[in-house]
Amino acid sequence: MSGERAAAARNNAEWCDLVCACHGLPGAFDADAWSVPLRSPPWYPDAVTLRPGVPADALLARIDPGPGASVKDSFADLDLRPYGFQVLFTADWIHRPAADRAAAPAAEVARPLTPVRTPDGLAAWAAVHGGGELFRPALLADPRVTVLARYAADGALTGGAVLNRGGPLTGVSNVFAVDGDATPIWAGIPAAAAGAALVGYESGADLAPALRAGFTTAGPLRVWVRD
């Protein structure tokens, strides 16, 4: 699973880079990591490691390591405690092969996920998801990004997700459901991604619906934060 894990980390770093760019924060990639030199937007890390064994000193030199700093430790092999960091959460990278279209119950895909195409639509999506100004209209103009929404019969937004394409992989993030049951959202994601190979990460109870949708785990990750 090491190749899938590295590919998932790279795709996630590309998504973080897209979000930061929309906020005027250009990121930098090299073989070790992706990073931004200034504080990233809320919920997003200041660095994402892209291989095992990245030296902590070199990684932290690329970011503002003061209070509020965060690092996505993609291979769960860093120890940032000596630098004042604590583990915020652990999670699992997930992967679903291309064209693996396991049938989902009809009730779960009766209302497919549809792309959000307008700034007003994105604002409405963000109001339900949470995050508000985090999701800026520039995301809709990027051909690599698709913001997905699921609507009830009365037009109410009931859930959604974000896809970001990079090479042969499509990343899945920001999966949510208003009623707390994301199973129908995960069930609709493979079709919305046109059968592409999918990667992402989830933790705790959020992992189970992804596994039911045909994903498998590809290794652990950790997110470190400095108080």
Task: Report each predicted region and the residues it spans.
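N-terminal charged segments
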Residues: 1-66, 74, 125-144
